[in-house]
């Protein structure tokens, strides 16, 4: 993927449609929706990447409020720009295909974000894994109505903290993303399944990659480590995190 300051990630956490079984939801998300999105990516050069995390069964992790989590899926779609994303969401082709495939409840958690910093603890271990276990975290702003971007200093503070916490552990890679959701997300998502999403309240999103679930569980089982993880910059609300964890599947990578 090219280094472009306009590249954004559309991140969405979803809950299965009411009454759906594990098997039905897993099929609709990891097979049907996956195939639709891959087909879209073939026709849309602006769709640069697509990653899925299926949180079924629930992982054995309690950090970041995951012990009470009701979230079944996490999708991360990488776009060349927010303008390109907006253009596709408004296209007839999208609305006739992906826009009609609804497999989650209307109330979703979402963020339009940009990578702000990262640290790879084990480059060889990360690159050699065909499949990894990922923990995706949404950290809301302390003031929900604020649209101020998290500062460079706060990003650096958080990155430095995680770099110290993750050293010598099973954590392979960490990425922090700054939320850049437009001030009026309804204009972007009007007429799409994302209209009722909880957009614009997040300050940052975070991604933690591990070799497997056992390694991730061991990492988050350390209470002192988790306490340190929950110490976030003052503009953020660490107590109200939303997190989704599961095996990551990379479906599109350009």
Curated annotation (Swiss-Prot):
Molecular function terms, GO-annotated: isomerase activity
Keyword Isomerase: yes
Annotated consequence of substituting residue 33 to A/Q: Completely abolishes the catalytic activity
GO biological process: flavonoid biosynthetic process
SUPFAM superfamilies for this protein: Dimeric alpha+beta barrel
Alphabetical list of InterPro entries matching this protein: Dimeric_a/b-barrel
Active site residues of this protein: 33, 50
Functional pathway: Secondary metabolite biosynthesis; flavonoid biosynthesis
Entry keyword annotation includes Membrane: no
E.C. numbers: 5.5.1.6
Enzyme class: isomerase
Domain of life according to the entry: Eukaryota
Effect of loss of the gene: Impairs the formation of flavonones and leads to the accumulation of chalcone intermediates.
Reactions it catalyzes: a chalcone = a flavanone
Keywords noted in UniProt: Flavonoid biosynthesis, Isomerase
Primary role: Chalcone isomerase; part of the gene cluster that mediates the biosynthesis of chlorflavonin, a fungal flavonoid with acetolactate synthase inhibitory activity. Within the pathway, cfoK acts as chalcone isomerase (CHI), the key enzyme responsible for the tricyclic formation of flavanone through Michael-type intramolecular cyclization of chalcone. The hydrogen at C2'-OH is extracted by the imidazole ring of His-33, which induces the oxa-Michael addition to form the intermediate enolate through 6-endo-trig mode cyclization.
Protein name: Chalcone isomerase cfoK
Organism lineage: Eukaryota, Fungi, Dikarya, Ascomycota, Pezizomycotina
């Amino acid at each position: 993927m090219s280094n472009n300051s306009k590249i954004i990630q559309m991140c969405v956490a979803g809950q299965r449609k009411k009454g759906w079984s594990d098997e039905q939801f897993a099929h609709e998300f990891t097979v049907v929706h996956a195939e639709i999105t891959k087909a879209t990516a073939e026709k849309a050069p602006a769709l640069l990447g697509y990653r899925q995390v299926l949180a079924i069964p629930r992982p054995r992790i309690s950090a970041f409020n995951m012990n009470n989590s009701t979230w079944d899926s996490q999708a991360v779609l990488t776009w060349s720009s927010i303008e390109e994303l907006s253009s596709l969401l408004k296209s007839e082709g999208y609305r006739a295909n992906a826009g009609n495939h609804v497999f989650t409840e209307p109330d979703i958690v979402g963020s339009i974000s940009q990578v702000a910093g990262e640290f790879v603890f084990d480059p060889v271990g990360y690159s050699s894994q065909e499949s990894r276990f990922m923990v995706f975290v949404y950290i809301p702003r302390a003031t929900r109505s604020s649209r101020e971007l998290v500062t460079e200093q706060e990003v650096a503070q958080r990155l430095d903290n995680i770099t110290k916490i993750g050293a010598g552990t099973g954590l392979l890679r960490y990425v922090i993303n700054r939320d850049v959701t437009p001030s009026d997300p309804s204009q972007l998502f009007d007429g799409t399944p994302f209209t009722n999403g909880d957009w614009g309240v997040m300050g940052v999103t975070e991604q933690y990659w591990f070799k497997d679930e056992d390694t991730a569980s061991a990492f988050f089982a350390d209470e002192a480590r988790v306490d340190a993880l929950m110490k976030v910059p003052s503009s953020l609300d660490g107590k109200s995190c939303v997190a989704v964890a599961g095996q990551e599947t990379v479906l599109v990578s350009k």
